[in-house]
């Protein structure tokens, strides 16, 4: 039934029936291999392409010979601390040859700091950890299409798409004429282009295409007689209005398609062309040849005759991946080509005798291109670091968006849909919900990238019905030709199929064939899904929509204080945690010499010592806590690759995103209506779901026009009680508890001298006292925040820290909060079953089992049937049995516990086979009417915490134009009393309440002050005035040239003034600063959308770059 499997240092009992024939690859190798290729070969290719650079006379030649990367200035951790980029200096050996004098100068030139990839597959840019996402783009090559014209006739098209350069398109019309478009200009008869290539006579052209009738029809439309005429005709289309000559036309055509500098098919484009057109052009020819153009047209004629088939753009054989290395190379190429221009210019300007390579080369364009890519490219993303799974998935993400890709608005249904070629390459489950659905995917577990950028999936070779252990990696194109059996096809011990007919896939079709017809077999049932999806037990019993939510929500689980690996796992937990890079691994065999919370020292068998420093309480990108704990003891033996310390969300080397809790599926007093969740106070008391969150605040002392700011303890008008936790410098001490409004860093800013009265001036003159004119600009704890100070960092110019211009001192304060689970927090299981906590109930009032154990969570049974995620029920049953047996179980996706296994395990544990039991009401002790499903389910606390969302405002910033409060928590805004709310008050006839809300509580500036005065003096509230937004409306209408006046009932014009003088007077009397409501930097109106910090760094929020090809091509 089940058997023990060793995962790391722990045992899991697995239900898997299928033998693993292939180890899963390293899960972040897609990033590492690509970057390594770039360092080893990509850079060399670039320098080879650009070298040599000659001046216009051909006299000076600049060659790039070799390059080397130096040592990075700071280590990874230090880079994060100092807010700098983790990079190494790139030095290039350059040779300058003067052909006139034969003089050769060689120099090593510094070409800027090049960002390095960390061992975890990320980059540190300005102290923030970022990931470069791989991009799915159309592969260069030739594509054939066929469509039905409105007249009902089939029309055909062929497009040759290069990596960079002009497009070449052939198309037919209703009369079977064949046209060509060069670089999206107007159509020409296709034979004009063929003639221009040197096939001058009609006879030659007809012969070239075996006297094809379509070519004959096209020749009749073709007015050109010779190659020269054809060249001129093409030139006229490409450069209308310029006088055509045969030479200029020839050189233009040469440059368009046959010049390697202007036209590049790339290695992959040449490979695809040769493969599709059955050519044998050498692979290093990356431009078009005459044969290519003729063969692509010939292939289209074949398609027109009814043979062959059109291409499917969404097939993964026609889409390739641009990973880090290639994306970086493209950026570097842009930088180098800009630099090349500068070098050429300088060669002509500078004096030949004193010229050196150093003088010629300007590295600024190269550095800028790289910086821009890492800092602001759509594919360079702030790493999702909520938990280890989020990190891992982010590095394996495949995006069809970004420069040169699709745009969200333009992408139709077909592009987003699951395609049969995704099998084993791209997960059909894991993709975001919302506008990016289907455009962003995740690499499958066993998928790997081949040198051409196509995703390959592994299969076991089958010879004459016998499955061998030979493993072949196939691209989507290659797989089309074969019949592939599923991984769960039953086999004999020597690898023959047991059944007489085998289920298989052949291209898009499912077939039932004899064993001899099978060519390949899947290596594993989980090869079609991604890592996150492979972590869902009983995935096969869940509806796809809910599985998608389950996979996505696991990435949002907050690392908990006490981790606990699931009782019911899938066996993937260990691999995911190990490859995510959050755990510490032993590099060689040895013995543990010392293991403390700070570090682990291992003595290797060869006698050397290795010290592993552990990360303690660091802030992740998302504000969750990164902390490592040793899991080995002194004198323990360790092997190479063994996990010796747990990171966040890991438990003994296994991924542990949540906790195992006892749940019951029942309704309870309406507290679990609409997916709400009722939890026991035990989860709060025993810190089941307590997590640590760390926020970072910084204060900088700058130079201002009136003098430098100063970080100090001496703050004007502040009592000693407020300063009690500040040290002598005015910076808060570590360990202090702070809450809203407390000073973290005392800082004063010089104020301009104010006008003094005569008396004051006299006193000043006598005593020589210059008033200390400073104002308090201290860093305080924002609204709604509180916690303990865990770390303080001070950076100053004197200590040689790199600070922004104008900043003399920078202080960073880290505040940690322990957040227990509370009402309003979002929780979820792994099956897309999410809900919000509606009530936390006393332990003694919760329903309890016959043995007196109270349940910990009560879920609504109605959440299961309509959503069809039965996996959660299976997990609950099996979890109960696992707890009773004291085991941890593994039920891998598509190869896990069957229904019978679950019943048998329940029997073995001595539990009722139905998985149901009588529950008793904790308040009365009476049994509930029916038996209830009870068991252990793995439940996660998600990053949508109520503490981050709850918000209240009394007085705060107002928008400058409308004078209405801003919106959103981030702006400390108010709650919008919107159109529908106004209707509600209108419906009740609550006229005065409504008037108040629309005027004095909002944007009647005069009324605001007068109302305040009335409240202070205890008088009646005065009549409201004119709202500011009404004045804005009038001004806008007047700006359109409309004469708008406001009349009273008696047709007298009402003058709408600016803020009244008397109000200003009154304000002075009351000591109110009318402008204090405006924050120091004026905040302009916030957008309509809700402000949620989580989405600030989300790729969905970033605007797409404009796309390069037009609608016709997208069709």
From Swiss-Prot:
GO terms for biological process: DNA-templated transcription. Keywords: DNA-directed RNA polymerase, Nucleotidyltransferase, Transcription, Transferase. Its EC number is 2.7.7.6. GO terms for molecular function: DNA binding; DNA-directed RNA polymerase activity; ribonucleoside binding. It catalyses: RNA(n) + a ribonucleoside 5'-triphosphate = RNA(n+1) + diphosphate. GO terms for cellular component: DNA-directed RNA polymerase complex. Residues 1084-1115 are annotated as: Disordered. Residues 1088-1115 have a biased composition (Acidic residues). Signal peptide: none annotated. PANTHER family: DNA-DIRECTED RNA POLYMERASE I SUBUNIT 2. Belongs to the RNA polymerase beta chain family. NCBIfam families: PRK00405.1 (NF001616), rpoB (TIGR02013). This is DNA-directed RNA polymerase subunit beta. It comes from Desulfitobacterium hafniense (strain DSM 10664 / DCB-2).
């Amino acid at each position: 039934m089940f058997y023990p499997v060793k995962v790391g240092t722990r045992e899991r009992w697995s239900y898997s029936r299928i033998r693993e024939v292939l180890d899963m690859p390293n899960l972040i190798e897609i990033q590492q291999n690509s970057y390594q290729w770039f360092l080893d070969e990509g850079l060399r290719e670039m320098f080879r392409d650009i070298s040599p650079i000659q001046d216009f006379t051909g006299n000076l030649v600049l060659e790039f010979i070799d390059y080397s990367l130096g040592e990075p200035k700071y280590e990874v951790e230090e880079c994060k601390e100092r807010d700098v980029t983790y990079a190494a200096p790139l030095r290039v050996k350059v040779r300058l040859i003067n052909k006139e004098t034969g003089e050769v100068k060689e120099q090593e030139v510094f070409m800027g700091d090049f960002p390095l990839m960390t061992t975890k597959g990320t980059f540190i840019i300005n102290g923030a950890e970022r990931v470069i996402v791989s991009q799915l783009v159309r592969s260069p090559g030739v594509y054939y299409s066929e469509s039905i014209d409105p007249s009902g006739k089939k029309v055909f098209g062929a497009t040759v798409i290069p990596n960079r350069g002009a497009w070449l398109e052939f198309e037919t019309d209703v009369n079977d004429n064949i046209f060509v478009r060069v670089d999206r200009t107007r159509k020409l008869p296709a034979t004009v282009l063929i003639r221009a290539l040197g096939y001058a006579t009609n006879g030659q052209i007809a012969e070239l295409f075996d006297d094809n009738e379509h070519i004959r029809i096209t020749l009749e439309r073709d007015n050109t007689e010779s190659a020269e005429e054809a060249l001129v005709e093409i030139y006229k289309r490409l450069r209308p209005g310029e006088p055509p000559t045969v030479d200029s036309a020839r050189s233009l055509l040469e440059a368009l398609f046959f010049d390697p500098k202007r036209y590049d098919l790339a290695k992959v484009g040449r490979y695809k062309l040769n493969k599709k057109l059955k050519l044998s052009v050498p692979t290093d020819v990356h431009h078009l040849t005459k044969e290519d153009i003729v063969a692509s047209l010939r292939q289209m004629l074949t398609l027109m005759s009814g043979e062959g088939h059109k291409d499917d753009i969404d097939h993964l054989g026609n889409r390739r991946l641009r990973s880090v290395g290639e994306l970086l190379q493209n950026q570097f190429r842009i930088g180098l080509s800009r630099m090349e221009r500068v070098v050429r210019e300088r060669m002509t300007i500078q004096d030949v005798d004193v010229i050196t390579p150093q003088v010629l080369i300007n590295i600024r364009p190269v550095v800028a291109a790289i910086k821009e890519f890492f800092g602001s490219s759509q594919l360079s993303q702030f790493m999702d670091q909520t938990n280890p799974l989020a990190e891992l998935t982010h590095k394996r993400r495949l995006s069809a968006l970004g420069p040169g890709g699709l745009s969200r608005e333009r992408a139709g249904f077909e592009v987003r849909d699951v395609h049969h070629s995704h099998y084993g390459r791209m997960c059909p489950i894991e993709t975001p919900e919302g506008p990016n659905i289907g455009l962003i995917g995740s690499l499958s577990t066993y998928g790997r990238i081949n040198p051409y950028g196509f995703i390959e999936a592994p299969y076991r070779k089958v010879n004459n019905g016998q499955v061998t252990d030979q493993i072949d990696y196939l691209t989507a194109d290659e797989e089309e030709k074969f019949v592939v059996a599923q991984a769960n096809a039953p086999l004999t011990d020597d690898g023959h199929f047991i059944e007489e007919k085998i289920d298989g896939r052949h291209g898009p079709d499912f077939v039932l064939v004899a064993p001899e017809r099978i060519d390949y077999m899947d290596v594993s049932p989980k090869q079609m899904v991604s890592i996150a999806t492979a972590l869902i037990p009983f995935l096969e019993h869940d509806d796809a929509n809910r599985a998608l939510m389950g996979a996505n929500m696991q990435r949002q689980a907050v690392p908990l204080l006490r981790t606990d690996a699931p009782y019911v796992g899938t066996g993937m937990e260990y691999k995911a945690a190990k490859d995510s890079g959050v755990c510490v691994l032993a590099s060689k065999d040895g013995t543990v010499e010392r293991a403390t919370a700070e570090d682990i020292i291992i003595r290797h068998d060869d006698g050397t010592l290795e010290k592993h420093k552990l990360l303690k309480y660091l802030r992740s990108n998302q504000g969750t806590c990164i902390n490592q704990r040793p899991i080995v003891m002194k004198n323990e033996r360790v092997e190479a690759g063994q996990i010796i310390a747990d990171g966040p969300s890991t438990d003994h080397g296994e991924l542990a995103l949540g906790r195992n809790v006892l749940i019951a599926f029942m309704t309870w007093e309406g507290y679990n209506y609409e997916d709400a969740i009722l939890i026991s106070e035990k989860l709060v008391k025993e810190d089941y779901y307590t997590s640590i969150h760390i926020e970072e605040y910084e204060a900088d002392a700058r130079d201002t026009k009136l003098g430098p700011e100063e970080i100090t303890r001496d703050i004007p008008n502040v009592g000693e009680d407020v300063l009690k936790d500040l040290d002598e410098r005015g910076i808060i001490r570590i360990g202090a508890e702070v809450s809203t409004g407390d000073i973290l860093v005392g800082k004063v800013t010089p104020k301009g001298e104010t006008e003094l009265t005569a008396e004051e001036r006299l006193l000043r003159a006598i005593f020589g006292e210059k008033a200390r004119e400073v104002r308090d600009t201290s860093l305080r704890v924002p609204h709604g925040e509180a916690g303990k100070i865990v770390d303080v960092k001070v950076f100053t110019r004197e200590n040689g820290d790199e600070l922004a211009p104008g900043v003399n001192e920078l202080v960073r304060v880290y505040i940690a909060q322990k957040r227990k689970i509370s009402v309003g927090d979002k929780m979820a299981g792994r099956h897309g079953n999410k809900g919000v906590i509606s009530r936390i109930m006393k332990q003694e009032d919760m329903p309890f089992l016959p043995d007196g154990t109270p349940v910990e969570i009560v879920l609504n049974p109605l959440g299961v049937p309509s959503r069809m995620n039965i996996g959660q029920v299976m997990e609950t049953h099996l979890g109960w049995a696992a707890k009773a047996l004291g085991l941890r179980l593994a039920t891998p996706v598509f190869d896990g516990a069957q229904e019978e296994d679950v019943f048998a395990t329940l029997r073995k544990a001595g539990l009722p086979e139905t998985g149901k039991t009588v529950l008793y009401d904790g308040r009365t002790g009476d049994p509930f009417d029916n038996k209830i499903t009870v068991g252990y389910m793995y439940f996660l606390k998600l990053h949508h915490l109520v503490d981050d969302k709850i918000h209240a405002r009394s007085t705060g910033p107002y928008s400058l134009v409308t004078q209405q409060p801003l919106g959103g928590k981030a702006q400390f805004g108010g709650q919008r009393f919107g159109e529908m709310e106004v209707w509600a008050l209108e419906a009740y006839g609550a006229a005065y309440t409504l008037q108040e809300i629309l005027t004095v509580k909002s944007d009647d500036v005069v009324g605001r002050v007068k109302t305040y005065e009335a409240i202070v003096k205890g008088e009646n509230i005065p009549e409201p005035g004119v709202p500011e937004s009404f004045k804005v409306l009038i001004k806008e209408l007047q700006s359109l040239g409309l004469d708008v006046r406001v009349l009273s009932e008696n047709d007298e014009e009402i003058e709408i003034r600016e803020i009244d003088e008397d109000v200003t007077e009154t304000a002075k009397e009351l000591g109110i600063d009318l402008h204090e409501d405006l924050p120091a930097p004026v905040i302009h109106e916030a957008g309509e959308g809700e402000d949620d910090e989580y989405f600030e760094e989300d790729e969905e929020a970033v605007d797409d770059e404009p796309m390069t090809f037009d609608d016709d091509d997208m069709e």
